[in-house]
Curated annotation (Swiss-Prot):
InterPro entries: Nucleotide-bd_a/b_plait_sf (IPR012677), Ribosomal_uL23 (IPR019985), Ribosomal_uL23-like (IPR013025), Ribosomal_uL23/eL15/eS24_sf (IPR012678), Ribosomal_uL23_CS (IPR001014). Belongs to the universal ribosomal protein uL23 family. One of its GO terms (cellular component) is ribosome. NCBIfam families: PRK14548.1 (NF011118), uL23_arch (TIGR03636). This is Large ribosomal subunit protein uL23. SUPFAM superfamilies: Ribosomal proteins S24e, L23 and L15e (SSF54189). Binds to 23S rRNA. One of the proteins that surrounds the polypeptide exit tunnel on the outside of the ribosome. One of its GO terms (molecular function) is structural constituent of ribosome.
């Protein structure tokens, strides 16, 4: 599985509300294209862009910005984050 978990930290919730962005921990060898396909398939949304980074713990974190016509808060509600 590509997606390990969705983060619901204070910063992640702020990004959902202000920038329409989901914060996801993914497998380290996953590409941006794989992340995009998985998110679009699971939640029936369109992804605008993805930024990734490797945390000091060695986890890969992806910031997934959704297109304007879709709401990250709707996805977060489906997941029970908000």
């Amino acid at each position: 599985m590509i997606i390990k978990e969705f983060l619901a930290t204070e910063k992640a919730v702020k990004l959902i509300e202000s920038q329409n962005t989901l914060t996801i921990i993914v497998n380290r060898n996953t590409t941006k294209k794989d992340i995009k396909n998985e998110v679009e398939k699971l939640f029936s949304v369109k992804v605008e862009k993805i930024n990734t980074l490797i945390t000091p713990k060695g986890e890969k974190k992806a910031y997934v910005k959704l297109k304007q016509e879709y709401k990250a808060s709707d996805v977060a509600h489906k997941l029970g984050m908000l």
